[in-house]
Amino acid sequence: MVETIEKATLLEKVQSAYEQLNTLLASLSEEQKTTPGVNSSWSVKDNLAHITAWQDLLPARIQSWIAGKPPAEFLPEFKTEDEVNEYLYQQHKDRPLPEVEAAFQSSYRRALAAVESVSEEALNTPVKSKNESRSAPLWRYINGEICEHYEEHGNMIRRWLGV
């Protein structure tokens, strides 16, 4: 049996995750946001650029799933997610903090609009990615790409801060 969710509940989860991450980010100085070491050589800024790069894919992925197709593979020339993440880090590490922060905010608004445009029925329809044998409801992918991703990186930042 497929686990379902009400659209309003998913939107609340997404907005709550966003607010929690933003609250954490707002509590940090520019120096804290740009100092390496959060996870390996990544700074808070690098984590934010990483989240943004993956989040930017979500609207197109949602449209693919709704159309009944698995989304195109992101950067298929790389064999592992770690290789993709390293590539993204190298692409964004020299971007200025204000640019990364603005890109994150814009990306979130686009992702939220994409989620808002999906019907509750579609959110609860099983879908799968290209390399997966099992399917899950669309809302689970959205939850993972936004809520769980924010939580994962927020926790890394908190551990680094010692809080």
Give the ranges of each region predicted by the language model:
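Acidic/histidine-rich alpha-helical segments that form the ligand environment
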Residues: 13, 83-124
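Short, contiguous alpha-helical
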Residues: 34-83, 124-163
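Surface-exposed helix-capping loop/turn segments at secondary-structure junctions
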Residues: 26-33, 116-124, 163
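A short, mixed-charge helix-start or loop-turn motif at secondary-structure junctions
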Residues: 3-7, 90-94, 135-139
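Hydrophobic alpha-helical core bundles mediating ligand binding, dimerization, or RNAP-core interactions
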Residues: 14, 18-21, 25, 58, ...
